[in-house]
């Protein structure tokens, strides 16, 4: 029997995938799995029993990923599960930035008691006029799950779409429309495009990547959209660019005191994945990842350990080992198993940066003594009997 705990409400459609071998717990005590959306986990004390954390969403800033890796806790996210919801909001943001739809709606609300509001509307509508997005140039920084969907949708609406992503995956490239043009540098993006939308993860290398230098290279009157992470944009430089007219509109999904209330900024309260469909898709993917890991030892979409798949566990003794990616580890593992008279039927070892993961199918179950010996190896963080 496995136990899981939800730190946030998780869509029931996902939880329904758990079978009778899983029990929902009210606390973290004795849980093997944790499901989370936005709850802050950096100051949480996790029990030794926790083997996996699944984030029902893409960003993992609220999870101490490195600390989890040190403890052998595999952290999953659900890339692409909320992509369509974010894509649709990006498109809405482009339209709202192109015409003063919000201002027009607010005007109607203010003047709703005027008897001749219909005639007033005809006189006042010019102040809310704007431009169409058809034929405009859109630059997309980052062509992952969301960026590629935005690219295809914008192209279908008649925009001239350019994409920049030096790390684009094969799958994402295959899914792009042939009409999407490739930009080889950020300088090309900044200098040519009418609209720029950012879809990259928040890393040390991307923090405040949209800065004063970047704004200086952009076309006058550019529209900037950020539905990825708030810290990708240097907001002090942004305010200067808005006040000078370099940036016409900034549309973001991240509210704070700097951007809220500025007339050149449209802010939504983190609505990107706030759709029923996105929440369900994220929950379903997260639960499937948890089950495959706990029942088979397989890893897919982990942010701190490598992908690893040995299929459905049918062996008498499959063990999963998280450890440092250091020399001589495999020989130490196999030496202990051999000394215990345990024959290896199948085995795989994968690494990701500082950390590695080993799955071993044995022809017979490992003894408690053998498992303790594996755990005692320097660099091994967790040894788990899958079956």
Residues of each region from the PLM?
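NAD(P)-dependent dehydrogenase/reductase Rossmann-like domain
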Residues: 250, 263, 271-387
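Rossmann-like adenosine-cofactor binding region
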Residues: 42-44, 166-258, 274
């Amino acid at each position: 029997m496995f136990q899981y705990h939800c730190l946030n409400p998780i869509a029931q459609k996902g939880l329904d995938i758990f079978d009778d071998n899983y029990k929902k717990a009210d606390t973290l005590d004795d849980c093997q799995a944790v499901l989370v959306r936005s709850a802050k986990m950096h100051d949480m004390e996790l029990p030794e029993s926790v083997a996996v954390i699944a984030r029902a969403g893409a960003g993992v800033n609220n999870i101490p990923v490195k600390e989890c890796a040190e403890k052998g806790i595999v952290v999953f996210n659900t890339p692409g599960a909320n992509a369509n919801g974010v894509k649709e909001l990006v498109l809405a943001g482009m339209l709202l930035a192109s015409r003063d739809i919000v201002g027009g709606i607010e005007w109607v609300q203010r003047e709703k008691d005027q008897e001749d509001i219909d005639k007033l509307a005809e006189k006042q509508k010019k102040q809310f006029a704007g431009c169409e997005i058809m034929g405009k140039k859109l630059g997309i920084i980052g062509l992952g799950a969301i960026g590629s969907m935005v690219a295809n949708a914008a192209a279908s609406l008649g925009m001239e779409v350019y994409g920049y992503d030096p790390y684009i995956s094969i799958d994402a490239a295959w899914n792009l429309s042939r009409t999407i043009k490739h930009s080889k540098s950020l300088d090309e993006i900044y200098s040519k495009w009418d609209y720029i939308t950012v879809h990259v993860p928040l890393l040390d290398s991307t923090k405040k990547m949209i800065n004063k230098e970047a704004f200086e290279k952009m076309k006058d009157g550019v529209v900037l959209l950020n539905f990825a992470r708030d810290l990708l944009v240097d907001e002090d430089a942004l305010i200067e660019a808005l006040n000078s007219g370099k940036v016409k509109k900034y549309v973001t999904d991240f509210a704070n005191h700097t951007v809220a209330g500025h007339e050149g900024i449209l802010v939504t309260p983190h609505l990107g994945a706030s759709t029923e469909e996105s929440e369900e898709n994220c929950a379903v993917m997260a639960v499937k990842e948890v089950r495959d890991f706990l029942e088979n030892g397989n890893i897919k979409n982990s942010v701190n350990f490598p992908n690893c798949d040995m299929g459905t566990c049918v062996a008498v003794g499959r063990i999963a080992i998280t450890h440092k990616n250091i020399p001589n580890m495999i020989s130490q593992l196999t030496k202990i198993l051999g000394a215990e008279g345990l024959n290896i039927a199948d085995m795989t070892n994968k690494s990701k940066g500082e950390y590695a993961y080993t799955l071993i199918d044995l022809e017979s179950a490992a003894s408690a003594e053998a498992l303790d010996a594996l755990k005692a190896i320097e660099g091994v963080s967790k040894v788990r009997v899958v079956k």
